[in-house]
Amino acid sequence: MLRPKKQSLKPKLKHRPFLKWAGGKFRLTDEINKAFPNKKNCLIEPFVGAGAVFLNSNFERYILADINPDLINLFNIVKXNVDGYIEDCKPIFFADDANTPDYYYAKRRQFNASTEPFERSIIFLYLNRFGFNGLCRYNSKNEFNVPFGAYKTHYFPEDELRYFAHKAQSAVFLCCDFQKTFEFADKDSVIYCDPPYAPLQQETNFTGYAGNEFGLAQQRALADLAKSIQKEKQISILISNHDTKFTREIYNGAKFKRVKVQRSISQNPEKRVKVKELIAIFGARK
């Protein structure tokens, strides 16, 4: 069992992630916290994303994973040296032509050509903040291919980076899949899963997962593993997803908590409507 440094943090205000993120759970952190069991000291997240739940929860230890190596590389760099990271980010963010298509696509080409972890981490943040709606998407060649966002104004998230680095001292960041992440669970853990959304309509059978498909078979595999590990370890496991006939079927046996969320990522602003989601809770709240 990994043992990151213990640290008790009690956030008084909600803390935004320093990354924009499709499907992020910032608006749902209060509801998710209410569903967590008491007297558990380690939160495990197999799909950490931008880390909204991590930043707004109060566990002594965190094991946070994602299959996106760029994301985990960034988190580990910010954790280890946030001052140096911020200093080296600013020349890119505050360049006179930073908010232009030519600059953006030049940086995207530089990112895709780079194999240097620190350089990639800096450009990854720039692409995230200046790209279209905070999407993180790769093509079949594993090249980042999100288009320019064309926003009027931009914000450099220095305060958010510093809070993340502070809280990250109690966390371990791992690049691995959900099956491997589940292996770290013990009796003192709770697992929260925020997988790519299952489709609202069955015929839409694909969700991007760091360049890989996370389709209905993977959704079912996650649900089956959650049931198995919950029974074996006698711990609570929570999964967020769309509230559909399919998700209710695969999460059969869980307690359901329904919520409505404003969908924030869409190319058509008229389609930004409230969507029904659920939190499936496996295991009694203790």
From Swiss-Prot:
It holds the Pfam family MethyltransfD12. Keywords: DNA replication, DNA-binding, Methyltransferase, S-adenosyl-L-methionine, Transferase. S-adenosyl-L-methionine binds at residues 21, 25, 66, 194. InterPro entries: Ade_MeTrfase_dom_2 (IPR023095), DNA_methylase_N6_adenine_CS (IPR002052), M_m6A_EcoRV (IPR012263), MeTrfase_D12 (IPR012327), SAM-dependent_MTases_sf (IPR029063). It is an enzyme of class 2 (transferase). It comes from the Bacteria. One of its GO terms (biological process) is DNA restriction-modification system. Coiled coil: none annotated. It catalyses: a 2'-deoxyadenosine in DNA + S-adenosyl-L-methionine = an N(6)-methyl-2'-deoxyadenosine in DNA + S-adenosyl-L-homocysteine + H(+). GO terms for molecular function: S-adenosyl-L-methionine binding; sequence-specific DNA binding; site-specific DNA-methyltransferase (adenine-specific) activity. Gene3D superfamilies: Adenine-specific Methyltransferase, Domain 2, Vaccinia Virus protein VP39. Its EC number is 2.1.1.72. PANTHER family: DNA ADENINE METHYLASE. May be involved in methyl-directed DNA mismatch repair, initiation of chromosome replication and gene expression. Belongs to the N(4)/N(6)-methyltransferase family. This is DNA adenine methylase. It comes from Haemophilus influenzae (strain ATCC 51907 / DSM 11121 / KW20 / Rd).
